[in-house]
């Protein structure tokens, strides 16, 4: 039976084994997917052992996405630009392909929620690894503009410069944004995990916009609660992005795209128990 794994530290909280087990059942694939705690300085050894034992592919979560980027012998274009890898696949020639499916997971979840991105103005909050991983797939949807904002403006400017060849992307200081100019706001910061807000002006929120928080929790996230209370038309958390990036990884490994909607519904139910 083909074996797959997710590496992380910590890893006990990972929903990936649950998601991929449902995907395998849905698509009648004979495969096993487990979670493995890798030592903080031991990703390479853990990956070596896994692939040497016949492993076919793995997902990578914090803090190993940059280690996985270095580990891969080949990189997809989106992984190169993301500077991080969340999916590894053993190739027939023995090489290891590194890919990043996070951004596609985000886009697929937005589309599943009937959020149109073509011709829209998108504000991306944050300029860390989570933001960098989603910019290329967002630009591929042809928004009229993607603005990156961050507390440290220079980081946002660096990302805007990196992705400028791929679409209309710019940067802005977070304290200069005070007009309701955006159709979609995506929060890529992890501030909400500790109940914090990213520091946006309330005047950005309007009734016909979508606010998306890339983190998720059993209850509404701090960012989405803030946006909803200010009258945002739709708020979405990152649970669907988690399922979407998993579906993209599954497609890379097995050549079949599983359906996300049913798995997301089941995952949401378990999260709220």
Curated annotation (Swiss-Prot):
Annotated metabolic or biological route of this protein: Metabolic intermediate biosynthesis; chorismate biosynthesis; chorismate from D-erythrose 4-phosphate and phosphoenolpyruvate: step 4/7
GO BP term, pick one: aromatic amino acid family biosynthetic process
Record's keyword annotation contains rRNA-binding: no
InterPro entries the UniProt entry points to: Aminoacid_DH-like_N_sf (IPR046346), NAD(P)-bd_dom_sf (IPR036291), SDH_C (IPR041121), Shikimate_DH (IPR011342), Shikimate_DH-bd_N (IPR013708), Shikimate_DH_fam (IPR022893), Shikm_DH/Glu-tRNA_Rdtase (IPR006151)
Chain residues that bind shikimate: 14-16, 61, 86, 102, 216
Alphabetical keyword list: Amino-acid biosynthesis, Aromatic amino acid biosynthesis, NADP, Oxidoreductase
Reaction it catalyzes: shikimate + NADP(+) = 3-dehydroshikimate + NADPH + H(+)
GO molecular function terms noted in the UniProt entry: NADP binding; shikimate 3-dehydrogenase (NADP+) activity
Binding site for NADP(+): 77, 126-130, 150-155, 214, 238
Gene Ontology cellular component list: cytosol
EC number: 1.1.1.25
Residues annotated as catalytic: 65
Enzyme class: oxidoreductase
Subunit details: Homodimer.
The protein, known as: Shikimate dehydrogenase (NADP(+))
Gene name tied to this protein: aroE
């Amino acid at each position: 039976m083909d074996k797959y794994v997710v590496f992380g530290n910590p890893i006990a909280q990972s929903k990936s084994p649950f998601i991929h087990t449902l995907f395998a059942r849905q698509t009648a694939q004979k495969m096993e997917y487990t979670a493995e705690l890798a030592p903080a300085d031991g990703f390479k050894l853990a990956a070596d052992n896994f692939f040497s034992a016949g492993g076919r592919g793995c997902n990578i979560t914090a803090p190993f996405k940059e280690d996985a980027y270095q580990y891969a012998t080949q990189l997809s274009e989106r992984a190169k630009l993301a500077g991080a890898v969340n999916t590894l696949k053993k190739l027939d020639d023995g090489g290891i392909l590194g890919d990043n499916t996070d951004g596609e997971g985000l886009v697929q979840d937005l589309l599943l929620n009937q959020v149109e991105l073509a011709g829209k103005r998108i504000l991306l909050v944050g300029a860390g690894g989570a933001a960098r991983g989603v910019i290329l797939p967002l630009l591929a949807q042809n928004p009229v503009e993607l603005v990156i904002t961050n507390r440290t403006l220079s980081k946002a400017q660096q990302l805007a410069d990196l992705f400028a060849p791929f679409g209309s992307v710019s940067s802005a200081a977070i304290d200069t944004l005070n007009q309701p100019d955006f159709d979609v706001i995506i929060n890529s910061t992890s501030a909400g995990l500790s109940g914090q807000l990213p520091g946006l002006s309330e005047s950005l929120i309007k009734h016909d916009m979508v606010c998306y928080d890339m983190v998720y929790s059993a209850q509404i996230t701090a960012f989405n609660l803030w946006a909803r209370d200010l009258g945002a038309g739709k708020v979405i958390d990152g649970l669907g992005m988690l399922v979407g990036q998993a579906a993209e990884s599954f497609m890379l490994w097995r050549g079949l795209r599983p359906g996300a909607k049913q798995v997301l519904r089941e995952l949401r139910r378990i999260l709220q128990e």
